[in-house]
Design a protein with these regions (language model features):
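Long, leucine- and charge-enriched amphipathic alpha-helices
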Residues: 491, 498, 505-507, 511-515
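Acidic, low-complexity intrinsically disordered segments
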Residues: 465-496
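Long, low-complexity, intrinsically disordered segments
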Residues: 551-568
Length: 568
């Protein structure tokens, strides 16, 4: 199959490996090739394989032109590179499962062609076989995922989806998969290169790939940082092939659109779904995503904390540290790594530990898992965590909906509270004092989730507002800016406390040295102690800010006209 490769001489980026792969049969030859495929031996493949085939053929996984031979397979598995040294983090292997497929494979040889058909037995692609080889499933799991634990979804997929013999060779795509509701939003690399650099004339584009969560404020923090210096923002929510509990794809796309339409610069932001096979390879998958962004034409890759993370299998910053294994020029894309984003009520802004010095008692965490769980409990997360435009749509599409008979969603309530409200177990309120005893996970119930949510709604913005008010009252010396009611209240407090002190002074004078009834009457010592406390309260009462006080703050050593340049 011959196609004319795209040229990138005038672009600020190049596809990985230098050539954007195009293994899609030309339209004029398609019907003929489909008919020829029907005459070939056939192997039936599942939807995940169909998606991978399409990604290879359309250049998403350049420089790969098909499934890997044994040499490349082993090189990638052991070193994270193709046999020629090109960085490639995950093996693209094809080992069909099933007795019928195994029988077909036994009759194939190097040089043969085989049709790959979907569940409806329609030819999807033709594979020309360059290699057939056995592989070790346990070794694959250990090298790729760092574990052989079947509870890891990637490990489970090896044993559940893969046969014993792997076929390598170039692919020719005959029919694209139907993207259903996302078909109208589908963009292949050849489309985005043209959009970025021919139509929009961008000189830089930041890519961002995200999974099962609706657009939240942590994402937005990363996006806005990028838009300060990069021309375009290319957002690719992953659709299809997700984990079992998630926000359904169409709702996530709608949630994205609702926020982008309202809060993002329209000419600089592009939303395009990405349909991929979930590999669940943690840090290695992060490298893959960066190279996918590169093949779509992005000059920059935005990587958050725990990108492509799988539960507790990997350190939360493993997706960052893996980039230390490769030189920037080998990757060919500017990778921007972002720490965990949270909302600090003391800073009154979104921040990371790199920029915020405050204690966790002031924080609202932004946890994708926690967000989904709150939606299941029927609670919109705090606006500082997810914009209501996004949450309102996402709550309609969360799967599963509601909670189980045990009062929990897919996680115990205590984990939800801990993931979203890190202060709650130890502090009485957001930014508040410590509890006498921290709450144990067993003590935390759905009522605590409700209480923490209401606390955040009421006080997330109040903390900094209260601080600001205190500073304004003290520092404003424009009389028109002083709140008269506050000064009136302070005057009243002072007068009333002076009245209390006057009465207590009389009481001390009249009190006996020893009271006849220690519950009904006070002796001089006790009355004196009350007087001391009352005087301390008076001293601690802030004074009213009068015009005389304000005038004392405004003075200059020279006549005012001198500051305007008039020395006469």
């Amino acid at each position: 199959m011959k196609t004319t490769p795209m040229t990138f001489a005038n672009c600020p980026q190049q596809p990985h490996g230098g050539v954007l792969v195009d293994r899609v049969v030309p339209e004029a030859q398609r019907e003929k090739e489909i008919a020829r495929a029907r005459s070939l031996p056939s192997i039936r493949v599942d939807l995940e394989a169909v998606i991978t085939i399409e990604m290879i053929a359309t250049g998403v996984l350049s420089p790969n032109t098909g499934f890997m031979n044994e040499e490349n397979y082993k090189s990638v598995l052991n070193t994270g590179r193709l046999a020629d040294g090109t960085v490639w983090p995950v093996p693209l292997s094809f080992a069909p499962i099933g007795d019928r497929n195994a029988e077909v494979i036994r009759q194939l040889s190097v040089g043969d062609e085989v049709a790959l058909t979907n569940v409806d037995n329609d030819p999807v692609a033709i594979l020309k076989i360059d290699d057939l080889f056995d592989y070790d499933k346990t070794e694959r799991a250990r090298q790729l995922f760092g574990t052989t634990d079947r509870s890891h979804p990637g490990v489970d997929s090896i044993y559940r989806r893969m046969g014993d013999v792997s076929l390598g060779g170039p692919l020719t795509l005959l029919q694209r998969a139907d993207w259903g509701p996302f078909e109208k939003l589908r963009q292949e690399p050849k489309d985005t290169w043209n959009l970025f650099y021919t139509e929009k004339k961008f000189r830089s584009v930041a890519g961002f790939i995200t999974g099962a969560n609706p657009l939240h404020r942590g994402h937005e923090y990363i996006h806005r940082n990028a838009l300060e210096e990069i021309d375009g923002l290319f957002l690719q929510p992953l659709v299809e092939m997700a984990k079992r509990e998630y926000v359904r794809h169409e709702y996530r796309m709608l949630a994205y659109r609702s926020v982008l339409d309202t809060y993002y610069p329209k000419e600089r932001t592009i939303l395009s779904p990405l349909r991929v096979t979930y590999i669940f390879a943690g840090p290695r998958e992060t490298i893959l995503h960066a190279l996918i962004m590169k093949n779509y034409g992005c000059t920059h890759a935005l990587i958050g904390r725990d990108h492509a993370g799988i539960g507790s299998f990997y350190d939360k910053y493993a997706s960052h540290s893996i980039f230390d294994e490769f030189k920037p020029e080998e990757l060919g894309i500017d990778v921007r790594l972002f720490h965990e984003v949270f909302y600090c009520t003391r800073c009154a802004s979104h921040a990371t530990t790199q920029t915020c010095p405050h204690d966790t008692k002031y924080r609202l965490n932004i946890s994708g898992t926690g967000i989904r769980e709150m939606l299941r409990h029927g609670i919109l997360p705090p606006k500082e965590v997810v914009r209501p435009e996004s949450a309102r749509i996402a709550i309609q599409g969360v799967q599963p909906k509601g909670i189980n008979n045990d009062g929990h969603g897919t996680l115990p309530v205590s984990k939800v509270v801990q993931s979203m409200f890190p202060y709650y177990a130890e502090h009485t309120r957001l930014g508040g004092s410590k509890r006498l005893q921290p709450l144990s996970p067993e003590e935390i119930t759905v009522r605590d989730l409700e209480a923490a949510s209401l606390d955040a709604r009421a006080n997330a913005t109040n903390i900094y507002n209260d601080i600001y008010r205190e500073y304004c009252t003290l520092a404003d010396h424009n009389p028109g800016m002083q709140p008269a009611w506050v000064n009136e209240a302070r005057d009243s407090m002072i007068r009333h406390q002076q009245m209390v002190i006057g009465d207590l002074q009389e009481k001390v004078q009249q009190a006996p040295e020893q009271a006849s009834d220690e519950f009904m009457y006070q002796d001089k010592s006790e009355a004196s102690r009350e007087l001391e406390v009352a005087k301390a309260l008076l001293e601690q009462t802030p004074p009213a800010v009068t015009e005389d006080v304000l005038q004392e703050r405004v003075w200059n050593p020279l006549p005012y006209q001198r500051y305007k340049g008039k020395d006469d």
